[in-house]
Amino acid sequence: MFGRQSGLGSSSNSSNLVEFRAGRMNMVGKMVHPDPRKGLVYMTQSDDGLMHFCWKDRTSGKVEDDLIVFPDDFEYKRVDQCKTGRVYVLKFKSSTRRMFFWMQEPKTDKDDEQCRRINELLNNPPSAHQRGGGGSNDGDLQYMLNNMSQQQLMQLFGGVGQMGGLSSLLGQMNSRTPSSRNTSSSGGGGASALQTPENVSVPRTPSAPSKSGSSRSSSNVNSQVGEGAGSSVDADAPGRSLNIDLSTALPGADAINQIIADPEHVKTLIVHLPESEDVDDDRKQQIKDNITSPQFQQALAQFSSALQSAQLGPVIKQFELSNEAVAAAFSGNLEDFVRALEKSLPPGATMGGKPSASEKKASDPETPTSVARDENTDPATEKQEEKQK
């Protein structure tokens, strides 16, 4: 989920899938207080297929909340504890955040139906066919990614070390397109049918290129990459790797035990887990449980497919990674992408570890974190440290 600053506030009521008059409520401490303004809660689906949960001020017409929501990430329900009004809450399943609304419709007979409809749209958004728009083309995913800010992309990936939003998005696309896609080489070889998420075309394992084949030239591939085009690339095109599923690399007990046996790896990974006072062995088990969880494995598999579809180039480019990593993402080469990430690490570091002590010490004074920490140091503490020296 993430918010947008503008874009859907001018939508006419006819385009809204559900709408009703309701005001916002503000939380102060453990209490929520009603905002007296007249408001409207509505849900709509944009052209890229994403669902929006919105609240706007009916007097000014300004949309103050515009949230892009993904299936299974939210729940909308009535607050039964409130006896003085009709209060509903939008619960974020991935965090403790809550948004409260108080009904402003004069009649109560449609409250339950509107609540049911909100949850239906949150968890089962209509497909393009249901909206009467026909089948969506392979450019939909790339169009959507190109129009996201870096902050939205970060939240789509669910933050560092998580990929909940991307998993939900690709899973939603997969449910809309149960049919398989055929990918064949330009030489006329047999097609390989693959079950893939909609708009994510995963290449089949390429065969050795024929000398007399009419495979696409490197210049043509580079031209399409530069134009942001190419929702798929020929299987025989240079720069593509074998179809790799990252989720198959970690499930083995030996691989996971090797990761958690290294204290540096454990320190790197636990920062991405919920805070806990568990002892070291319990934290290792928590890491192991997360890596082997179906949710993580599914997200990892879907990221593998998405990157190898050559459609994540615009996403990777916004994270200001190396040119090699961006080029690998545009070409859909997962192996080159991982190698590029390894090259960009500080000397002595690995994909799962940290720099050596000497390297870390040399780089610390230049990091923003260190500067921020110095700026926030208590002056009294500094004087005491100087006396001790």
Curated annotation (Swiss-Prot):
Residues 194-204 have a biased composition (Polar residues). The modification Phosphoserine is found at S6, S185, S207, S217, S218, S219. GO terms for biological process: positive regulation of smoothened signaling pathway; proteasome assembly; proteasome-mediated ubiquitin-dependent protein catabolic process; ubiquitin-dependent protein catabolic process. It is found in: Cytoplasm; Nucleus. Keywords: Cytoplasm, Nucleus, Phosphoprotein, Proteasome. Residues 168-185, 207-223 have a biased composition (Low complexity). Residues 16-124 form the PH domain. Residues 237-351 form the DEUBAD domain. Its main location: cytoplasm. The modification Phosphothreonine is found at T196, T205, T367. Interacts with the 26S proteasome. May function as a proteasomal ubiquitin receptor. May promote the deubiquitinating activity associated with the 26S proteasome. This is Proteasomal ubiquitin receptor ADRM1 homolog. It comes from Drosophila melanogaster (Fruit fly). The lineage of its organism: Eukaryota, Metazoa, Ecdysozoa, Arthropoda, Hexapoda.
